[in-house]
């Protein structure tokens, strides 16, 4: 069980994987969406119910790293998170494939660092979690090769950023790859990108494994 601090504000940020078809209003039945962030909010919330914890989901379907920056003040800085968890990157590859309008790995890194600098300038004690972008398979060979040959650069950038900012890095590619000999990868990532219910559960477990010790030692 992960123990949180009194009045922690835990913010999940990212793209559609984090969005999870979340509600855009105040209805508490829907505001967290479905996915790993809902699993974490429900478990951590129940285990810390006396501590007035707030869980916020601001994942936005289709977002690239540049889109995240465009809404950063409203959807991050103004919310004053004490714990910030980010999963972003796969859409930059998708947009580059379709429209040449995503960031390459170098620009991804520059914007990512800018996002974190702004957060830490307002609250240097913000606990940051950087989740690794990941990919399964695509049936189209050319598209599959494009993703598999390119995503490594984004993953390396995310890991390096986590190291430089003393953030927790949550590796996810190896998690899904470890199931390739056990099951059809599409049972975990139904279209090669978006997790199934089981896939989200695996992400939530990995998040807790990586975060627990450092989060509790704040």
Where is each model-derived feature located?
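Short beta->alpha junction loops
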Residues: 56-64
């Amino acid at each position: 069980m992960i123990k949180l601090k009194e009045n922690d504000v835990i913010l999940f940020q990212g793209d559609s994987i984090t969005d999870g078809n979340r509600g855009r209003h105040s209805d508490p039945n829907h505001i967290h969406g479905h996915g790993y962030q809902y699993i974490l909010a429900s478990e951590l919330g129940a285990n810390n119910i006396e501590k007035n914890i707030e869980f916020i989901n601001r994942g936005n379907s289709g977002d690239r790293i540049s889109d995240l920056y465009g809404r950063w003040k409203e959807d991050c800085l103004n919310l004053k998170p004490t714990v910030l968890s980010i999963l972003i990157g796969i859409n930059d590859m998708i947009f580059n494939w379709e429209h040449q309008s995503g960031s390459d790995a170098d620009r991804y890194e520059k914007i990512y660092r800018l996002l974190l600098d702004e957060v830490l300038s307002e609250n240097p004690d913000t606990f940051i979690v950087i989740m690794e972008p990941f990919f399964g398979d695509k049936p189209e060979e050319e598209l599959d090769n494009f993703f598999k040959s390119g995503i490594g650069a984004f993953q390396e950038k995310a890991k390096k950023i986590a190291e430089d900012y003393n953030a927790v890095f949550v590796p996810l590619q190896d998690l899904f790859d470890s199931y390739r000999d056990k099951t059809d990868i599409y049972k975990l990532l139904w279209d090669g990108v978006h997790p199934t219910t089981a896939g989200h559960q695996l992400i939530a477990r990995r998040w807790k494994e990586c975060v627990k010790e450092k989060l509790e030692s704040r």
